């Protein structure tokens, strides 16, 4: 099972350079195997609306949250505190540490923009 990072979704939604690779990855996995964090969802909302692409975010909500089996993950307060420790230990920025802790907690493979990361 995969935790799909914000940048992977954005690559496809904003039709960036590697959008076809992302599309192939998403099509190769059943939606029941895919997860995303609340943080990723809100980040996608922030970015798309700042770019004036609200319709892309609205379609994303319909496709990913309402019409598919993609699981949405939210960290607890304990997880958030753990995230701060992980961030310092591995010198990660906030969003990467958030994704790392979510993947570790739920035993997911973290699908990043240009690689797949097995969190142990």
Language-model features, listed with the residues they occupy:
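Short, well-structured N-terminal submotif of metal-dependent ribonuclease cores
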Residues: 1-36, 50-62
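Histidine- and aromatic-rich ligand-binding microenvironments
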Residues: 5, 35-37, 92-93, 114-115
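A generic structural signal for short hydrophobic patches within well-formed alpha-helices
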Residues: 9-10, 41, 117-118
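Phosphate- and divalent-cation-binding pockets in alpha/beta enzyme and binding domains
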Residues: 21, 43-44, 82, 119-120
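Structured helix-beta-strand junction loops
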Residues: 28-32, 67, 106
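Short, conserved active-site loops that position catalytic residues or coordinate cofactors/metal ions
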Residues: 37-43
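Active-site-proximal, substrate-binding regions of enzyme catalytic domains
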Residues: 43-73, 78-80
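Active-site neighborhoods of divalent-metal-dependent phosphate/nucleic-acid chemistry enzymes
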Residues: 70-113
């Amino acid at each position: 099972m995969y935790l799909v990072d914000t940048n992977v979704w954005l690559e496809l939604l904003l039709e960036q350079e590697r959008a076809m690779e992302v599309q192939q990855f998403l099509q190769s996995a059943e939606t029941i195997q895919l997860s995303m964090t609340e943080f990723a969802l809100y980040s996608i909302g922030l970015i798309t609306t700042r770019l004036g692409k609200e319709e892309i975010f609205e379609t994303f909500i319909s496709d990913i949250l309402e019409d598919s089996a993609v699981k949405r993950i939210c960290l607890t307060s304990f997880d958030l505190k753990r995230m701060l420790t992980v961030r310092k230990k591995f010198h990660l920025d906030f969003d990467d540490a958030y994704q790392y802790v979510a993947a570790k907690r739920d035993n997911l493979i973290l699908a990043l923009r240009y690689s797949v990361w097995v969190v142990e």
